[in-house]
Amino acid sequence: MTSQLHKKGEAWSARFSEPMSELVKRYTSSVFFDKRLALVDIAGSLAHANMLAAQKIISADDLAAIERGMAQIKGEIERGEFEWQLDLEDVHLNIEARLTALIGDAGKRLHTGRSRNDQVATDIRLWLRGEIDRIGGLLNDLRGALIDLAEQNADTIMPGFTHLQVAQPVTFGHHLLAYVEMFSRDAERMRDCRTRVNRLPLGAAALAGTSYPIDRHAVAKSLGFDGICANSLDAVSDRDFAIEFTAAAALVMTHVSRFSEELVLWMSPRVGFIDIADRFCTGSSIMPQKKNPDVPELARGKTGRVNGHLMALLTLMKGQPLAYNKDNQEDKEPLFDTVDTVADTLRIFAEMVAGITVKPDAMRAAALQGFSTATDLADYLVKRGLPFRDAHEAVAHAVKICDDRGIDLADLTLDEMKRELPNVAQLIGDDVFDYLTLEGSVASRNHPGGTAPDQVRAAAQAARAALGK
């Protein structure tokens, strides 16, 4: 009977009086997307088999046969020779059926003391743990590229913006290091998420545990888990670890999207702060002159894709009673695509950032517009005893006058400045123009976290040192 069931692929079919329809088979099968879990499924099965043998639940001969068969199956999968079958429903039954075909009854004993419920939960955690580590490395690569570019531009002055209006001068290096901070927090979130992913569900079986004398801690140790899931119902039924990862991934993409928006803006001919290497751009099928920043534009769009996956997983879980439900089969495609999208995006962005051409003259010209040193003039007056609100009002008046005349504050002569600001004329000296230069403005922000070039260089060094931790 069992052999026939394995041949048919329906490990549960003895309970039913008619076979599943072909349409339902296609509808319920997951093998053509969950087969990417195959290698971690094999790793989990080998750890389980070793534990079963150590606990005298299966024989040493069975274990040797299982290890031999799994080695062959792993090779077939890696060479692309493994034949995946829709009738076998999922990655687990495909591998088990092939194992049984290779080694006979020993293959049928592998599933002793476990269910596909705890098996798949283990597979996902094993796989996701590896992907979190990979994404952490890719975040480091992007941070490193940003730090390199920031160090090269510690003295490059550009306008800082609020409300997309010129606000105060900053250095381009300081601006880039803001994204280093964001991606550093993303890396921290990934590491923190990993601690909750790295718990072993195996041993929970279907939902209640198993009557066999298993050793869950031994399996956890052999697979590199930090410990076991403490409750069997929770172990098989919840996917909060996948949701948490996807939320962290959505934040990664949100930061990428913000950076992308600025890259698109900076590359626009009307701004012209940077150029992106040709290999990251496309042209137009009708307009010969076009060079379009497709990579950052697509990254903005793909952020919505990852956000959608987060909502899909949250919605998937919100109405499920304990314990396992078939709904959970729908966790894999959003999770897989999130990993692929984030990993591809980070890898491309690290390469793209390294190839950015900076245009300092355009940045400086933009910083000279929009009265970006107005706050410096107000600070100058405050340091001479004027209350800040009064200084703010006086400088706002001066800005209005200059705006009407189409000139900058620095274009006023000392006499003109005193004449236009009679209430504070006695506070204004020849040194006022030192405060109205772009270099003087950024140099004055010489404190940790400030935009002064020396602080930017120090922050870049600290950020680089943090990459090694």
Swiss-Prot record:
E.C. code: 4.3.2.1
Pathway listed: Amino-acid biosynthesis; L-arginine biosynthesis; L-arginine from L-ornithine and carbamoyl phosphate: step 3/3
Main location: cytoplasm
PROSITE patterns assigned to the protein according to its UniProt record, in alphabetical order: FUMARATE_LYASES (PS00163)
Molecular function GO labels: argininosuccinate lyase activity
BP-aspect Gene Ontology terms: arginine biosynthetic process via ornithine; L-arginine biosynthetic process
Cysteines engaged in disulfide bonds, as pairs: none
Protein name as annotated: Argininosuccinate lyase
Species, as recorded: Burkholderia multivorans (strain ATCC 17616 / 249)
Gene that specifies this protein: argH
